[in-house]
């Protein structure tokens, strides 16, 4: 998992409440057995004018010019600004996969659905909760200035705006540690690989029948 320390990026404003996971990545794309390739289909039903299916050449599909991610001023955005209850709906982990593979490193919103919120951390995507008033202010600035950028300093736990304003945010020490070091669940486990191997060797010597094999 990619480490997250300080990130500065263009902000894309998704000015809708209750954006659910089916809007983030529609159900037909969940058939894939891979964890990659979801970025081109993030927000598929809003992003394109036709109906998307797995395996299509998305470069030939007609874009919806009114959708925020298709507007030139927000191209290359890596910070998503959203409204309350972002990521509600079914608990598909494909949703943070799609957002991350689109290019987003962080999402700023007044609130998130719990399961989506947790899935973001597990995949290196930083969900930041600010107050509705703070989010309103950021929406206004994003609309007012082309190429509006935010700097997210995870170590300091603050979002910095170009006008000098700072917006502190909360994160647990464990989640912060994992993101700063690029550890997902597997990475955390592998840090103890030597101890795991030692335990398994000792267990096998004492209880070989559990592995249905003999030690000799």
Swiss-Prot record:
GO terms for molecular function: 3-isopropylmalate dehydratase activity. InterPro entries: 3-IsopropMal_deHydase_ssu (IPR004431), Aconitase/3IPM_dehydase_swvl (IPR015928), AconitaseA/IPMdHydase_ssu_swvl (IPR000573), IPMI_Swivel (IPR033940), LeuD (IPR050075). It holds the Pfam family Aconitase_C. Its EC number is 4.2.1.33. GO terms for cellular component: 3-isopropylmalate dehydratase complex. It comes from the Bacteria. Pathway: Amino-acid biosynthesis; L-leucine biosynthesis; L-leucine from 3-methyl-2-oxobutanoate: step 2/4. One of its GO terms (biological process) is L-leucine biosynthetic process. It is an enzyme of class 4 (lyase). Signal peptide: none annotated. Gene3D superfamilies: Aconitase, domain 4. It catalyses: (2R,3S)-3-isopropylmalate = (2S)-2-isopropylmalate. Keywords: Amino-acid biosynthesis, Branched-chain amino acid biosynthesis, Leucine biosynthesis, Lyase. NCBIfam families: leuD, PRK01641.1. Belongs to the LeuD family. LeuD type 1 subfamily. Heterodimer of LeuC and LeuD. HAMAP family: LeuD_type1 (MF_01031). PANTHER family: 3-ISOPROPYLMALATE DEHYDRATASE SMALL SUBUNIT, 3-ISOPROPYLMALATE DEHYDRATASE SMALL SUBUNIT 2-RELATED-RELATED. Catalyzes the isomerization between 2-isopropylmalate and 3-isopropylmalate, via the formation of 2-isopropylmaleate. This is 3-isopropylmalate dehydratase small subunit. It comes from Burkholderia mallei (strain ATCC 23344). The gene is leuD.
């Amino acid at each position: 998992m990619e480490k997250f320390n300080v990130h500065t990026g263009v902000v894309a404003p998704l000015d809708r409440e209750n954006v659910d996971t089916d809007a983030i990545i529609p159900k037909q794309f969940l058939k894939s057995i891979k964890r990659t390739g979801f970025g081109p289909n993030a927000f598929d039903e809003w992003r394109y004018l036709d109906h998307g299916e797995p395996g299509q050449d998305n470069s030939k599909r007609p874009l919806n010019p009114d959708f925020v991610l298709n507007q030139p001023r927000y191209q290359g955005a890596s910070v998503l600004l959203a409204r309350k209850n972002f990521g509600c709906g079914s608990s598909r982990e494909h949703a943070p996969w799609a957002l991350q593979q689109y290019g987003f490193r962080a999402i700023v919103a007044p609130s998130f659905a719990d399961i989506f919120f947790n899935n973001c951390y597990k995949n290196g995507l930083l969900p930041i909760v600010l107050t509705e008033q703070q989010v309103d202010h950021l929406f206004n600035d994003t609309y007012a200035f082309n190429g509006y950028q935010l700097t997210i300093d995870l170590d300091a736990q603050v979002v910095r705006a170009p006008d000098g304003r700072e917006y502190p945010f909360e994160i647990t020490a464990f989640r912060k540690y994992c993101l700063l070091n690029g550890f997902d669940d597997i990475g955390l486990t592998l840090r103890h690989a030597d101890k795991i191997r030692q335990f398994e060797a000792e267990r096998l010597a004492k209880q070989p029948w559990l592995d249905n094999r003999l030690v000799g």
